[in-house]
């Protein structure tokens, strides 16, 4: 077939596809007018930097996993709070029936505006999540947790019955349905997951996550959250030092790590992250126990510097802006700043 004939045949095929499936169903990559990946801040600038784009990507699936009480739900709730602060709508599928509204409120979540569902079965949870995403109105949805998404057959069966692979099949089907809807609506879906140990593993890590392998494939970002140290005020434990490893990242280089403080009852210490990152990148100067910024003293000791920044939010915002500018992290866009390219589902 001659070159002109091939071009004409291709144009006819593209016109037919656009007519049948809608404009934009097929396009040349150079003609793609989609904006750069937008992000929802996590509440920790260290984690935002590790993610490479300033937060959790919009329109993607995120998996947050780790041991018990490591800070998984706290990270997710901070993302919810930041999405709401930008004018977005958030939903929380509480499959564990363990959401604490008071704690969520302390992290900045607008509990009056948060959509919450406590489903009876895994099928119900994922169907509700899918319907909310397809509405196109959500900015972020959290499913807590994958391990608690119990298939209906298991709930209705006897205690000793075997239900091999039911949850994995349920997750695989749900993620196949949701992926395109998430991209179309710009909704970020966070799946919180638990760790299990594989029996008989001689080499490598025996740890694995629940719900089969589908979530590992469909997730654009996977975060491994670990508690590495207990923060103490004298002899009293006041929080945890947390390390997050970005074990998978489809929107930026993976395998970066971030460390930050989680204060009991207060969540991620934003000011603590600013101090750590500011010192690391030469924006805040540390001399002995004193912290200074632009010639002004922030305080003696990290706790005093943290309190000073908490009392002076404009200064904290200025430091955050300088850190992001130095590291080339663009400011996160608000949910309605750029509309996603419509895709027929």
From Swiss-Prot:
Recorded GO cellular component terms are:
cytosol
- PROSITE patterns from the xrefs? RECA_1, RECA_2, RECA_3
Name where it mostly resides.
Answer: cytoplasm
- Localization annotation: Cytoplasm
Q: Name one Pfam family in it.
A: RecA
- So where does ATP get bound? 66-73
Instruction: Name any Gene Ontology BP term.
Output: DNA recombination
GO molecular function annotations of the record: ATP binding; ATP hydrolysis activity; ATP-dependent DNA damage sensor activity; damaged DNA binding; single-stranded DNA binding
Q: Which UniProt keywords apply?
A: ATP-binding, Cytoplasm, DNA damage, DNA recombination, DNA repair, DNA-binding, Nucleotide-binding, SOS response
Coiled-coil intervals, chain numbering = none
Q: Which SUPFAM superfamilies does the record associate with it? A: P-loop containing nucleoside triphosphate hydrolases, RecA protein, C-terminal domain
- Entries under HAMAP family matching the protein: RecA
Relate the protein's function as given in its record: Can catalyze the hydrolysis of ATP in the presence of single-stranded DNA, the ATP-dependent uptake of single-stranded DNA by duplex DNA, and the ATP-dependent hybridization of homologous single-stranded DNAs. It interacts with LexA causing its activation and leading to its autocatalytic cleavage.
The entry sums up its family as follows: Belongs to the RecA family.
Q: What is this protein called?
A: Protein RecA
